[in-house]
Structures are given as structure tokens and as C-alpha cells.
Amino acid sequence: MRPSNREHDQLRPVTITRNFTNYAEGSVLVEFGQTKVICNASIVEGVPRFLKGKNQGWITAEYGMLPRATHSRTEREASKGKQGGRTLEIQRLIGRSLRACIDLKVLGENTITLDCDVIQADGGTRTAAITGSCVAMRDAIHWMVQREKIKKMPAFNYVAAVSVGIYRGQPVLDLDYAEDVLAETDMNVVMNEQGHFIEVQGTAEDNSFNREQLNSMLSLAEIGIPQLIEIQKNA
């Protein structure tokens, strides 16, 4: 039995609230159960130096957690003077995932920056950030079209992410914190609406996992992610 009494293939309740803040070109509050993340998409003119003159855009991300997003206060990384390895890894994952949504050439020499701020963490913050940021980014691109910064709305490929793992010997979908801390295996899966994989990150925590368990976890992701994409489209 899972701590939340969910079935092994059941997501937590997921909600996506668009236009959550007033100033960002795209803004979303995404909630996976008790995990809550604000995802703001900002349009910035210009691209990184390595893309100058190539007539294409860029998508990047920043990620952070509020000090009391967790059970006890965590010191802000800004006060330490540097970002931790986990933060950098998550930022890169979010950026890679969202660059799979569109052809970067349609953005011109503009950058979309996704700021993902975790206001409450109960497991799966990075997967929630990817899922919410996809919607915020689509709204930001629509803003660009309205202001004639680009000619038309480009083809957009929705991307979502979910965690899967082995909890007490059983593959489960969308781990919360109570499961995550005891999981024998923890994996994050990113997929698009065609059912293609964008990224798979998996780590054995206490015990190794076999091919059958890996297949079971990927099958759970294939159950959960289409549901998340449907929620994105209906937000």
C-alpha cells in the first residue's frame, strides 16, 4: 500500500493555473499533489554568444526552492554565493526538455527563460517544473505572436515529465516525498505528445533494478505522461 493510498499507476491530483502572475509573458502555478511550483516564462531579446548570427532562438531555465519549501528551512543558495550541483542539473534538464517543444529557428534571435520556483516540495519538483514550464512557454510564444515579434504560432510539441520508481519492491508512478526517501529506485522520465522519450534519468538507491523492472517503470511513465499532456492542453 502506498502512503497516499493511490494505486501503483495513479498520479497525484494535478492542476495547472495559467496567468498566475501579472508581469511574466507566460506564468503558471503547477501542483502535483502537495508539490507546488511557480513557472514564469520571460522573453529576452538576444541569444547566447555561441548562437549570434545564426538566426535562431534559445530556451533556458533557472530553478530554485524557497527556504521553507521543505519541512525545515534550507538556506538560500544566493546567500552561499553559488548554486549547488543538484540545482544546476535540474536547470539543464528543464532547458533540454523544453527545447524539444519547438523549432528554435522560429523564435528569431530571442531567448525564452523559464524561472521555476518551488514554493512547496513533496517530491517530483523537477518533473512538475518541466510540466508547468511547457504551458508557461506556450503562453509566452503566443505573447510574441500577438506583439508581432514572430509571424505566427509555430508548431508546438507538448512535453511533460513524471517520476517513477520502485517502492517496497513495486514499480509506482509519481512518487511523493514519503515514497521518494524510501525508494529503491528513482527515475525521471520526459516524453512528448507523440509518446517519444526526451530524457530518462534513473538511479538505483538501495538495490539494483533489472530489465523487467525498468520496462515496468517506463510503462508507468507511458500511462502518466499522456494524462499530464491532456491536463496541459486543457489548462
UniProtKB/Swiss-Prot annotation:
Matching Pfam families: RNase_PH, RNase_PH_C
PROSITE patterns the record matches: RIBONUCLEASE_PH (PS01277)
Gene Ontology biological-process entries: rRNA catabolic process; rRNA processing; tRNA processing
Binding site for phosphate: R86, G124, T125, R126
InterPro entries with a match to the protein in the record: ExoRNase_PH_dom1, ExoRNase_PH_dom2, ExoRNase_PH_dom2_sf, PNPase/RNase_PH_dom_sf, Ribosomal_Su5_D2-typ_SF, RNase_PH, RNase_PH_bac-type, RNase_PH_CS
NCBIfam families in UniProt: RNasePH
PANTHER family named in the record: EXOSOME COMPLEX COMPONENT, EXOSOME COMPLEX COMPONENT RRP41
Name of the protein in its database record: Ribonuclease PH
